[in-house]
């Protein structure tokens, strides 16, 4: 059936939970593109035959195939665009370094796009807030307090706070640290926020 593979790509993303990135379906995308190429070539030969032999009975078939081509294109673009939106959201959630489990699900082109996006975002953040720039990925929601209690989930090593003091982050140790310095480590799974 026409457009079935393209619809399966869209269904695959629809079934994936929000915030998760399923593996890039290169095989499915290739099959859709091959179907589109075959439809286009069939249309070209039928149009040429309709012109040369005056066969008007081929026009409805050509229109049908053209509609299938447009639907395949829409589904393919929707699949790729939704993946880019999810990858962009991952930058805000995990920071500039994605876990290997997520990078494994990305195509080479998506990895390249992610790298360009994070560089553009970093350039923009450096242009804000004077000499040091402003990290707009921190405090996505307004904080209730400036300091929070955190527990270290794995050995991390030395962690320097703004006032110059260093804190040794060892597994199961608890600390009272500035929220904005901890949020990145919380998202990476190094720290967890201890709710009293």
Swiss-Prot record:
One of its GO terms (cellular component) is GINS complex. The keyword Ribonucleoprotein does not apply. InterPro entries: GINS_A, GINS_bundle-like_dom_sf, GINS_Psf1, PSF1_C. Pfam families: PSF1_C, Sld5. Coiled coil: none annotated. Its main location: nucleus. Component of the GINS complex which is a heterotetramer of GINS1, GINS2, GINS3 and GINS4. Forms a stable subcomplex with GINS4. GINS complex interacts with DNA primase in vitro. Component of the CMG helicase complex, a hexameric ring of related MCM2-7 subunits stabilized by CDC45 and the tetrameric GINS complex. PANTHER family: DNA REPLICATION COMPLEX GINS PROTEIN PSF1, PARTNER OF SLD5. Belongs to the GINS1/PSF1 family. This is DNA replication complex GINS protein PSF1. It comes from Mus musculus (Mouse). The gene is Gins1.
């Amino acid at each position: 059936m026409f457009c079935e593979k393209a619809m399966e790509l869209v269904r695959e993303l629809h079934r994936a939970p929000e915030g998760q990135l399923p593996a890039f379906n290169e095989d499915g995308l290739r099959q859709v593109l091959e179907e589109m190429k075959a439809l286009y070539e069939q249309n070209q030969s039928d149009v040429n035959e309709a012109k040369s032999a005056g066969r008007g009975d081929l026009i409805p078939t050509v229109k049908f195939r053209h509609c299938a081509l447009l639907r395949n294109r829409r589904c393919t673009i929707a699949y790729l665009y939704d993946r880019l939106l999810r990858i962009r959201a991952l930058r805000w959630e995990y920071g500039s370094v994605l876990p290997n489990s997520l990078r494994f699900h990305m195509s080479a082109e998506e990895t390249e796009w992610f790298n360009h996006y994070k560089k553009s975002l970093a350039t923009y953040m450096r242009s804000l807030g004077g000499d040091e720039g402003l990290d707009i990925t921190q405090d996505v929601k307004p904080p209730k307090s400036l300091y929070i209690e955190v527990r270290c989930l794995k050995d991390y090593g030395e962690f320097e706070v703004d006032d110059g003091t260093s804190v040794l982050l060892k597994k199961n140790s608890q600390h009272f640290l500035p929220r904005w310095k901890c949020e990145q480590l919380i998202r990476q799974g190094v720290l967890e926020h201890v709710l009293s």
